[in-house]
Design a protein with these regions (language model features):
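Basic, Lys/Arg-enriched alpha-helical interface segments
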Residues: 1-66, 75-80, 88-95
Length: 95
């Protein structure tokens, strides 16, 4: 699949890099998960991949860490990276 990166996702990644809250390893795990999704392979269950509900039901979430969540959707042939952040950051923006 081809990847589309939302402007919000780019801003979120930059914010999280600057925060110092996430390690280089965390970003490597994120990259690995994105590659796995792009290749349409199953994501390891430890990352708790699940669909969102309600008005966000077209999106899915993956927990990179317990409180660092990737929000994305698949619209073939695209994998759309929508946003990333903590629960409050992500779900506040989804409303």
């Amino acid at each position: 699949m081809k990847i589309k990166i939302a402007k919000r996702f780019k801003k979120d990644v930059e914010r999280d890099r600057r925060s110092g809250q996430y390690s280089q390893l965390d970003f490597e795990i994120l990259k690995h998960i994105i590659t796995t999704l792009q290749e349409e392979k199953p994501v390891d269950p430890i990352y708790k991949k699940h669909p969102l509900l309600g008005t966000s039901k077209r999106y899915e979430a993956i927990h990179i860490k317990s409180d660092w969540i990737l929000i994305f959707k698949v619209e073939k042939p695209f994998l759309i990276l929508a946003m990333i952040g903590s629960h409050p950051q992500v779900y506040k923006k989804m409303k």
